[in-house]
């Protein structure tokens, strides 16, 4: 009985939010789903020419251009922006690859709801929203997998946040990590 935004608050503040804090966090993530125009152009250029994960990896790296390097204690706002930005990028990549019209982010919606709306091009059902919230919560609690390890190694060198997440996305694309899910889905579809 929780949402992804509540878990983000828990990770961010080390405590569950009250309604005011939850509303504030939901709004901040929503605002972050609006991508810079230059990044939208990068996605449009690459989406049909490279794999989805290669496009996403490049986009995460390019998003780093818009962020200045900050001390470690100032990383949470950057990470929060990436949560919103990655959702929009993934939806755009999918829709461009399927030759579907793009759906603009709606910062007033919850994260799972807006991501599904941008991805599917229609209003998601409450069941779909709850399922995605649950999936995102499980991912937030995934612990120590290969992509997390990769991000930690990169961050451990004091590289910036976008470099660490770019490394994680690259690792996730491998057939023995996230790529395995892609192959399983292909088999299910066949």
Regions found by a protein language model. Give the residues of each.
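Hydrophobic alpha-helical bundle cores within soluble ligand-binding/oligomerization subdomains
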Residues: 1-190
